[in-house]
Amino acid sequence: MMKNRVTNIHFVGIGGVGMSGIAEVLHNLGFKVSGSDQARNAATEHLGSLGIQVYPGHTAEHVNGADVVVTSTAVKKENPEVVAALEQQIPVIPRALMLAELMRFRDGIAIAGTHGKTTTTSLTASILGAAGLDPTFVIGGKLNAAGTNARLGKGEYIVAEADESDASFLHLTPIMSVVTNIDEDHMDTYGHSVEKLHQAFIDFIHRMPFYGKAFLCIDSEHVRAILPKVSKPYATYGLDDTADIYATDIENVGAQMKFTVHVQMKGHEQGSFEVVLNMPGRHNVLNALAAIGVALEVGASVEAIQKGLLGFEGVGRRFQKYGDIKLPNGGTALLVDDYGHHPVEMAATLSAARGAYPEKRLVLAFQPHRYTRTRDLFEDFTKVLNTVDALVLTEVYAAGEEPIAAADSRALARAIRVLGKLEPIYCENVADLPEMLLNVLQDGDIVLNMGAGSINRVPAALLELSKQI
């Protein structure tokens, strides 16, 4: 139906991770796709290389000829392209609604949760690929093995992230869903009510048909709390032997995790098998268990699961290793980049770094994301930031918010200093961070560059500076 009525699809804010992936898949399905964005980035360059028209900036003329206009939550109603589309009676729809349309073409597998969505979606796509199922995927980060965050496969499944930040995951109608965990984040969306947050995830699970299946992580307290209200078929996973799929004998082997998977899921052969996951961290064992559950449900073999996890090449900005960088005083430091910006994610990633490189001094460069999050989770940030060996804090990435008194990086630095363990270094401008880090780092260190904002540009700048040494 959509193919008969829609030819030209225009994306406002096409360079965003969620938007660019959907645009690429639609282009590969044969639609004429265009888009606009204020900033040029790797995603807009990639889309341009595919033949997609990407306009710099936003003007009303860009929507001329469009059958539908797709927007992300970052795009304001006053955007000239949105205004022009509405004046011309061109439908303006959120990104999630277009993702829901894509799920009409395939059987959808939607991965939700406060943390771990991107990694779990990527692991699921990797295993399904190893099983020869050739899935379509739309991921919030670049799947390193594919070199992109989206791909149109020939198989029957589409694997996609389901975004709870604006409750837009309630547009999706998957046949299978995953909830990796539930945490108190993006609470403005839910009126600062845990009950409303819980209900949104219950409603998301209930978007499946009666023959669908959800995979729910019982290591999450909030997930356990919603289980009695879930009326659609589900299986549980976790590190507890009461789960339908659980892991034991978890072992850190360098930057990999080795563990035994036990399956006691209804309708499946009971038993256990060993796997090696090609990424560090106990939290990633949980992400792998979710992907294993989905894979077993679609009929993937144990061999395909083992192959997909061992051959996993990671995701952009999820414990992404850049290798050793040269230091001005001699020696080298290992550079790792990560998107983590919530204290729970950060604690898991820092623990993974300690487990993978126990002998190294851990240096963290961190850019908080949003003043509201810094304010709401101030104590949690202080605790997790105090666990590293050296800390460089750059100013909060506002993401469109106005500054909030005592919810900035200077306040965090003061609070950490009072604890008496660390002397945080404050870097007001993120552009100065690469040079500052080179002066802080010592031979043999691991430096973790972390945050969801403009700090993502630091690794490239650091590598460039390092080459000049």
Curated annotation (Swiss-Prot):
Give me the residues that bind ATP, please: 113-119
The EC number on file is: 6.3.2.8
Where does this chain mainly localize? cytoplasm
Gene3D superfamilies of this UniProt entry?
Mur ligase, C-terminal domain, Mur-like, catalytic domain, NAD(P)-binding Rossmann-like Domain
Cross-referenced Pfam families, in alphabetical order?
Mur_ligase (PF01225), Mur_ligase_C (PF02875), Mur_ligase_M (PF08245)
The UniProt catalytic activity note for this protein reads:
UDP-N-acetyl-alpha-D-muramate + L-alanine + ATP = UDP-N-acetyl-alpha-D-muramoyl-L-alanine + ADP + phosphate + H(+)
The biological processes this protein is annotated with in GO are:
cell division; cell wall organization; peptidoglycan biosynthetic process; regulation of cell shape
A GO cellular component annotation in the UniProt record: cytoplasm
Q: Which UniProt keywords apply?
A: ATP-binding, Cell cycle, Cell division, Cell shape, Cell wall biogenesis/degradation, Cytoplasm, Ligase, Nucleotide-binding, Peptidoglycan synthesis
User: Which Gene Ontology terms cover its molecular function?
Assistant: ATP binding; UDP-N-acetylmuramate-L-alanine ligase activity
Under which pathway is this protein filed?
Cell wall biogenesis; peptidoglycan biosynthesis
Where is it localised? Cytoplasm
Homology family: Belongs to the MurCDEF family.
Sum up the protein's function in the record's words.
Cell wall formation.
**NCBIfam families in the record, alphabetically?**
murC
Its name, as the record gives it, is UDP-N-acetylmuramate--L-alanine ligase
